[in-house]
Amino acid sequence: MGCFSSKHRKTQNDGGEKSIPINPVQTHVVPEHRKPQTPTPKPMTQPIHQQISTPSSNPVSVRDPDTILGKPFEDIRKFYSLGKELGRGQFGITYMCKEIGTGNTYACKSILKRKLISKQDKEDVKREIQIMQYLSGQPNIVEIKGAYEDRQSIHLVMELCAGGELFDRIIAQGHYSERAAAGIIRSIVNVVQICHFMGVVHRDLKPENFLLSSKEENAMLKATDFGLSVFIEEGKVYRDIVGSAYYVAPEVLRRSYGKEIDIWSAGVILYILLSGVPPFWAENEKGIFDEVIKGEIDFVSEPWPSISESAKDLVRKMLTKDPKRRITAAQVLEHPWIKGGEAPDKPIDSAVLSRMKQFRAMNKLKKLALKVIAESLSEEEIKGLKTMFANIDTDKSGTITYEELKTGLTRLGSRLSETEVKQLMEAADVDGNGTIDYYEFISATMHRYKLDRDEHVYKAFQHFDKDNSGHITRDELESAMKEYGMGDEASIKEVISEVDTDNDGRINFEEFCAMMRSGSTQPQGKLLPFH
């Protein structure tokens, strides 16, 4: 699978390698003599087109006025041959590609320009490339090879990471220790330290954004997604709500934050690495946010009584509510549990791996089930939502576009930023066609009306259980997911593995209910700010 970066990417390692042992992951800590003297150096001042590397040969002589990257159009196929698809997201597709001149293999993320609707979308893509170029050459960060643009797409060519996702490797091993977790968190916090010393705040740290560089036991862990990252500006307070619900810091929800949010997110990852579940858990994203604001950490439930005090001390320091008192990246790397060998090598309870497996990815079936429930609700149950949809759908097409959503929410008194409106659009758009239909709109908003009663869940289960056998079979799941444009092999395999807790190859009603009552339903990397 490839190292590729996108705010809208689908997990790469669907159906990937699952037989690789876990060792403490190779990492490089920035030596003291190589660290910049100031923690927040100025970002590069070169124009974006001077920062993006492309071959000097065969340039197109005329710069097109429609260019996004600010440089001449080039045909990527002059330099690379595109191979199999690695992943598909909201904005485009990632392929394996081979450099024609050398035969070297890379990952190529092709972003469709017609899906970059707003000026902000285009600026986000430029900034992502700029930051990846700026961080290029640093350990534990994916290398970007070059960026190309033609009339239809922007193509990012980057390092191919064949080792797959972090959690997949941990789960595949079947046994796990604090020492292994310490090696992993060292790599993750090393990325944070590099970013902060080079004047970048990541803003979306989560396990899915880290891949292994190869299938080797000692493969390096690489950060792959900088789509929400920004340059740190002296004295600036950030107010956009960004990130993923489970990993978001309390100050983000208060709309006043800085680089300290990355340490909080890394602390959440550490908690999951040690227990298999996130520290702040609820049945919907509002509940998760409430728990984050409270900041009460459970060290009583299993396996915490058997986890070392040193590990718990580090978790507490990383999940300190006050960002001014929160531990820094450099301090994490100096902590005795990380540096002093205090992390024991004894196996952690195997139940942690089971919980981690259930948690590891977004549950597509749950999102689909919410849409099915929305389609079966009565007018009384959804009350004003139909009117709200009609008011936003100004051209009466039956679907809401990004521009309609932005305009409509502003008219309704919303103060969401462009980034947040875009996140809402992506979260609600189940079939990924770039618009929200009526039932997608209802399913994205109905949680506020507590429409999670048993009869609705049972109706949704019956929708999938076509033969009324009391189980959702693989074929029934495939049929339902294809109906909504989600029926690729990897997605079906992912859903079965997440929901089928008794491992009989099908989903019974109890498993379905447990899934529906679990945590957030929103896509990884996005918050749904529509409460």
Swiss-Prot record:
EC numbers listed for it are 2.7.11.1
Q: Where is this region: Autoinhibitory domain?
A: 343-373
Look at the named UniProt entry and state the broad enzyme category this protein falls under.
transferase
Q: Which GO terms describe its cellular component?
A: cytosol; plasma membrane; plasmodesma
Q: Where is the Protein kinase domain?
A: 80-338
Binding site residues for Ca(2+) 4: 500, 502, 504, 506, 511
Positions modified as Phosphoserine?
A: 244
Q: Which compartments does it reside in?
A: Cell membrane
CDD domains annotated for this entry?
STKc_CAMK
- SMART domains, sorted: EFh (SM00054), S_TKc (SM00220)
Keywords of the record? ATP-binding, Calcium, Cell membrane, Kinase, Lipoprotein, Membrane, Metal-binding, Myristate, Nucleotide-binding, Phosphoprotein, Repeat, Serine/threonine-protein kinase, Transferase
Q: Which PROSITE patterns match?
A: EF_HAND_1 (PS00018), EF_HAND_2 (PS50222), PROTEIN_KINASE_ATP (PS00107), PROTEIN_KINASE_DOM (PS50011), PROTEIN_KINASE_ST (PS00108)
Instruction: State where composition is biased (Polar residues).
Output: 48-60
InterPro entries, A to Z: CDPK_Ser/Thr_kinases, EF-hand-dom_pair, EF_Hand_1_Ca_BS, EF_hand_dom, Kinase-like_dom_sf, Prot_kinase_dom, Protein_kinase_ATP_BS, Ser/Thr_kinase_AS
Quote the record's binding site residues for Ca(2+) 3: 465, 467, 469, 471, 476
Tell me the function of this protein: May play a role in signal transduction pathways that involve calcium as a second messenger. Mediates the phosphorylation and activation of the S-type anion efflux channel SLAC1.
Tell me the protein family, please.
Belongs to the protein kinase superfamily. Ser/Thr protein kinase family. CDPK subfamily.
- What name does this protein carry? Calcium-dependent protein kinase 21
Q: Which organism is it from?
A: Arabidopsis thaliana (Mouse-ear cress)
Gene from which the chain derives: CPK21
